UniProtKB/Swiss-Prot annotation:
Gene Ontology BP, a term: translation
UniProt family annotation: Belongs to the GatC family.
Transmembrane segments annotated in the record for this chain: none
Gene3D superfamilies in the record: Glu-tRNAGln amidotransferase C subunit, N-terminal domain
EC number(s) reported in the record: 6.3.5.-
Keyword ATP-binding among record annotations: yes
Protein name per Swiss-Prot or TrEMBL: Aspartyl/glutamyl-tRNA(Asn/Gln) amidotransferase subunit C
Length: 95
């Protein structure tokens, strides 16, 4: 699979990226190189290779799942222009 100049312009348009005509050949080469690399990865024989999530065997540290209120409600709402009972007061937006 290869990317042509029209495809580069379409991708740029969909991504809302401004691309000049001078940049199209460079981007075309970059995209084609990426696709070639992905095709190369597809040719790698991975039969018998166990899936892995990390190169080093380690366990995530776990904490006790304890429910609390954070004990900082006053600090959380301190910068709000209007509060009531630790809740933010906002202007009514739906009538």
């Amino acid at each position: 699979m290869s990317v042509d100049a029209t495809t580069v312009r379409r991708i740029a348009h969909l991504a809302r990226i401004a691309v000049t005509d001078a940049e199209v050949p460079h981007l075309q080469g970059e995209l084609n190189a990426m696709l070639a690399f992905v095709e190369q990865l597809g040719e790698v024989d991975v039969d018998g290779v166990e899936p892995m999530t990390s190169v080093t065997p380690m366990q995530m540290k776990k904490r006790v799942d304890a429910v609390n209120d954070g004990e900082i409600a006053d600090q959380v709402v301190a910068n709000a222009p209007a509060t009531e009972d630790h809740f933010f007061l906002v202007p009514k937006v739906v009538e």
